[in-house]
Regions:
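Extended, folded cores of ATP/NTP-driven motor/assembly subunits in large transport
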Residues: 1-406
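P-loop NTPase motor domains
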Residues: 54, 61-80, 87-91, 255, ...
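Hydrophobic anchor at the beta1->P-loop junction of P-loop NTPases
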Residues: 443
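Conserved lysine of the Walker
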Residues: 451
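Hydrophobic positions on the alpha1 helix immediately C-terminal to the Walker A/P-loop
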Residues: 454
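Post-Walker A helix-loop "phosphate-sensing" segment adjacent to the P-loop in P-loop NTPases
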Residues: 461-471
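A short helix-turn-beta junction within AAA+ P-loop NTPase domains corresponding to the substrate/partner-engaging
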Residues: 487-491, 700-713
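Conserved P-loop NTPase
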Residues: 728-781
Length: 782
């Protein structure tokens, strides 16, 4: 029969002469390898592709349906001339590698006590429920070809198609080279033992070493129902009985263990014409049996006899299957589910096996231990591209797609900052905003949701782990204690403060690529527009200001920007010396802010504006001084960004109560331009606000929010949730993670992907007391 022909063809290609392994190297069934990651296994070639997880479990019903159909389309696209193996790999995190990549090294700069506290928090997180396991996903394609060139051409074509289909699912697929592919097996066989050296195929060949020496364990023992790898225990199981209806969460639940394990789904697709012919023949047989039974009943004068239930059911199911194949774009497939798990002791192994069996029974399925086939089972479940277990089950595309390998998206970027734990998988969320297309960020949440704490935690991580500069616009005086504890400078800007910022400070590095004086002249024009009212400075007055600005800075520039910069008082006196009456009018209009009671920006700077961490505390500015104060502060921030860029240094800018900035045209326009330009200058901006609805009244702010690659959404009010759902395309299920949730919990949107998260920080630490805004917990000095 045709299907038997398909199976026999596959069995013939997979058949190998059995030889008893004389060493652990012989027990590895890979015969040859190539630098691009292709294996020769038996008489066939295999290649593995990795793919990332997607947010399936928290998606809405409609989104789940769309993902399911896209995944079914991927399965339909599999070539019937090859076999596919989809593998989920629970890999233990290597503690030494983790510490090297994430823990903060000591610097002996007076901040090491904070680094120790931060590292203790990270270590307590990684040893939590599931954080010690990373889940990887692979699809291995195996095909029989005459030589490596034909195989390489085939994998190139199939790989492009596969990666395209994965992209439709928002999953990123990539080919694995030989080092990446062999690393999978080394991690499995040797646990999380770090490699003394990276695998180098060329070097191994030159020395005459086998690649198997690098990845194989010291010993392998196979028993009736388990095996041993060095001092670890393992067991292979397979899915023996399938329920009539399987939930799409079964595979995710089977893999939801804090253990090293692999689960593989082998798929062998049948050509549609052969499948239809076989089902038609089967239906013909069923109809013949029914007709014969009816004829016998008629011969016995039993004309009212009803066809037996099992025969009627067989006819119905066969017709449905034929309809699936001919009208519903389904393909017939053979499937096999195998699973291997490892443990440190036999008792733990038996306990884990029972957990797996119980999970399968919950879904009305039966997982069984392979008896006397542990070696064949291991070769089948590992992503070599082999299938040595014959327990195949006939499935359609839909019934295969139910075994969906997706659960929850993970964000774990090397060299990034810790932002919390994935609320679904409990794994760490680590993001490097510098690697995003646009690393700018918003933190949105109602009062008490934890947005300030979240920003402070990010500031702490940046301050303790990098040499980047941090500038904070602080309208509510919330960041001062933390900044001072980290060795930074708090600049309190107000009419009554002893702290002064000279609005006319300028050095060689001022401004962008143009002449510093041209940039400063533009700034002073903007400043006077704020002083006398936007649109009230005439063209004649602008010319006078430009001339006077040059006169005031002439001597300072001749001295190569050395000495003290001029102040607004110098500009005021220069205006009074001009012959035009408009000049005296400008001087009179600006008198309140230069020689009057609001003259804080007309005096020489008396604070350290070169400190690595600066908080500009503008809480006491007042309505009269706010426009000019905002202008001077933002000018100082932007020029610090430019200066750092010229030095090759990264600058992080944080703006609290971001909605306040959009009450003033200049500050709104400044941040909009900064949002678009700062990436060019090695900078990143973060806006914090609780008044989302007020912020979104500005079209500019909406555009900035929609174009931000990194968002942290905490607990939201009902109206804000509706606004954000429409703007950011957040599903109802995802909205539940920002509805009446605890402080520090919510959603992270990173590069278009939305992940629920939770974040808590140990309360019995000095860092917590510096970061919290609760009055009874705040530490007023460190």
């Amino acid at each position: 029969m045709p299907i038997s022909k398909t199976l026999s063809k596959a069995a013939k290609a997979e058949k190998e002469k059995f030889t008893i392994p004389k060493s652990v190297q012989d027990a590895i069934p890979i015969q040859r390898i190539w630098p691009d990651g292709i294996f020769q296994v038996g008489r066939r070639f295999s290649k593995t592709f990795s793919f990332t997880d997607i947010n399936y479990s928290i998606a809405s019903k409609d989104d789940k349906t769309a993902m399911f159909l896209d995944y079914a389309e991927l399965l339909n696209a599999l070539d019937s001339g090859a076999s596919a193996k989809i593998t989920i790999n629970n890999r233990k995190v290597n503690k030494a590698e983790f510490e090297k990549s994430l823990l903060l090294p000591m610097k002996e700069d007076g901040l090491d006590p904070y680094r120790k506290e931060y590292n203790e928090m990270l270590l307590s997180t990684v040893t939590g429920v599931s954080s010690s396991v990373v889940q990887d996903r692979y699809i291995t394609i195996t095909v029989a070809k005459r030589n490596i060139d034909e195989a390489r051409t085939y994998f190139s074509r199939v790989g492009t198609d596969l990666i395209t289909h994965l992209a439709q699912l928002s999953s990123i697929g990539r080919e694995l080279d030989i080092a990446s592919r062999l690393q999978i097996f080394r991690d499995f066989f040797k646990g999380n033992e770090p490699a003394a050296f990276a695998f180098d195929l060329k070097e191994h060949m030159q020395k005459g070493h086998s690649f198997k020496d690098w990845l194989c364990p010291d010993s392998m023992e196979f028993h009736k129902d388990h095996f041993r790898l060095n001092d670890r225990w393992g067991r292979v199981l397979y899915l023996q009985d399938y329920a009539s209806y399987i939930k799409d969460s079964m595979i995710a639940e089977l893999c939801d263990m804090d253990r090293s394990l692999m689960l593989s789904i082998d798929i062998l697709t049948v050509p549609t014409d052969e499948a239809v012919r076989e089902i038609q023949n089967k239906l013909l047989g069923v109809e013949t049996n029914a007709a014969n039974w009816q004829r016998k009943q008629n011969a016995a004068n039993n004309f009212s006899a009803v066809l037996p239930y099992d025969m009627e059911q067989q006819r119905k199911e066969t017709k449905e299957l034929l309809d699936d194949l001919t009208n519903r774009d389904q393909r017939m497939m053979f499937g096999l589910v195998t699973m291997v798990h490892l443990a440190d002791s036999k008792e733990q192994l038996d306990s884990d096996t029972e957990t797996i069996l119980t999970t399968a029974r919950k879904h009305l399925c039966q997982m069984s231990v392979l008896r006397w086939q542990q070696k064949d089972g291991l070769d089948t479940v590992l992503p070599y591209g082999l299938r040595r277990i014959s327990a195949l089950r006939t499935l359609t595309t839909e019934s295969t797609a139910v075994l969906i390998p997706f659960r929850a998206q993970e964000i774990l970027q090397t060299g990034g900052i810790y932002y919390g734990q994935n609320a679904v998988s409990k794994n760490m969320i680590v993001v490097d905003r510098r690697k995003l297309l646009n690393g700018n960020s918003f933190r949105l949440g109602v009062s008490g949701s934890g947005k300030s704490f979240s920003a402070k935690e990010e500031i702490v991580s940046i301050a303790l782990s990098t040499n980047d500069d941090i500038l904070i616009l602080d309208p509510e005086s919330e960041f001062g204690f933390l900044v001072e504890a980290l060795g930074g400078e708090v600049i309190r800007v107000s009419a009554s403060s002893d702290t002064h910022l000279n609005a006319m400070d300028m050095d060689k590095a001022y401004g962008d690529e143009r002449n510093p004086l041209i940039e400063k002249s533009e700034f002073i024009l903007s400043l006077f527009e704020q002083l006398v009212g936007a649109g009230n400075v005439s063209a004649k007055e602008k010319s006078i200001l430009d001339r006077c600005t040059y006169d005031v800075y002439r001597e300072y520039m001749i001295n190569n920007y050395q000495g003290e910069a001029p102040t607004l008082k110098d500009l005021y006196h220069t205006l009074l010396k001009q012959p035009e009456p408009e000049a005296r009018g400008l001087a009179l209009s600006s008198e309140l802010f230069i020689t009057g009671s609001l003259n804080t920006f007309a005096q020489r700077t008396n604070v350290d504006t070169k400190a690595r961490i600066i908080a500009y505390d503008i809480r006491e500015l007042g309505e009269q001084l706010m426009p000019i104060g905002m202008l001077v502060t933002l000018d100082a921030i932007f020029n610090r960004v430019i200066q750092n860029w010229k030095k090759g240094k990264t600058t992080w800018v944080f703006a609290d109560e971001f909605y306040l900035l959009f009450r003033y045209a200049y500050s709104a326009d400044f941040f909009y331009k900064l949002w678009k330009r700062i990436r060019k200058y090695n900078g990143l901006v973060t806006g914090l606000t609780q008044n989302v609805e007020e912020l979104l009244r500005s079209d500019t702010a909406r555009l900035m929010l929609a174009n931000s690659e990194f968002l942290i959404l905490l607990n939201q009010s009902a109206t804000d949730r509706d606004e954000l759902a429409g703007l950011l395309h957040i599903s109802e299920n995802q909205l539940s993670y920002i509805t009446n949730v605890a402080a520090g919990c919510g959603l992270i949107r990173c590069a278009g992907n939305i992940v629920p998260f939770e974040n808590s920080f140990p309360r019995n630490t000095r860092l917590y007391q510096l970061m919290t805004t609760k009055p009874d917990e705040v530490l007023r000095g460190a």
